[in-house]
């Protein structure tokens, strides 16, 4: 399994099983509106940090912040019940 798919599966599992102390659980367990707001705030924060890293031309920081951005985007998608396969299919459509 590739790393991105494995991370996505772990996020889905944590949303479903709600293990104590999980960061994903902390982001996703409030009422849906509050949870979505928290996740969107994190996405905005990570997007800004990715932009700043790019402006600083710092490759390692771009990679680090991009991973955070992708992770939080995955949390949002999983919160809405969107599967990794659905996301993958959207990318396949765009390759045509």
From Swiss-Prot:
Involved pathway(s): Amino-acid biosynthesis; L-histidine biosynthesis; L-histidine from 5-phospho-alpha-D-ribose 1-diphosphate: step 2/9
UniProt-listed Enzyme Commission number(s): 3.6.1.31
GO biological process: L-histidine biosynthetic process
Keywords: Amino-acid biosynthesis, ATP-binding, Cytoplasm, Histidine biosynthesis, Hydrolase, Nucleotide-binding
Enzyme class: hydrolase
CDD domains: NTP-PPase_HisIE_like (cd11534)
InterPro entries per UniProt: HisE, PRib-ATP_PPHydrolase-like
GO MF: ATP binding; phosphoribosyl-ATP diphosphatase activity
Disulfide linkage: none
Localization per record: Cytoplasm
Gene it is expressed from: hisE
Organism listed in the record: Methanococcus vannielii (strain ATCC 35089 / DSM 1224 / JCM 13029 / OCM 148 / SB)
Gene3D superfamilies membership: MazG-like
GO cellular component: cytoplasm
Catalytically driven reaction(s): 1-(5-phospho-beta-D-ribosyl)-ATP + H2O = 1-(5-phospho-beta-D-ribosyl)-5'-AMP + diphosphate + H(+)
Protein name: Phosphoribosyl-ATP pyrophosphatase
Taxonomy of the source species: Archaea, Methanobacteriati, Methanobacteriota, Methanomada group, Methanococci
Family of the protein in this entry: Belongs to the PRA-PH family.
């Amino acid at each position: 399994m590739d790393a991105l798919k494995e991370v996505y599966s772990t996020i889905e599992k944590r949303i479903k099983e709600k293990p104590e102390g999980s960061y994903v659980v902390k982001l996703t367990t409030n009422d849906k509106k509050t949870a979505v707001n928290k996740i969107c705030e994190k996405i905005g924060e990570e997007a800004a940090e990715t932009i700043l890293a790019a402006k600083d031309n710092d490759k390692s920081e771009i990679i680090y912040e991009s991973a955070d951005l992708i992770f939080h985007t995955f949390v949002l998608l999983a919160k809405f019940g969107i599967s990794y396969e659905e996301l993958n299919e959207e990318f396949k459509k765009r390759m045509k």
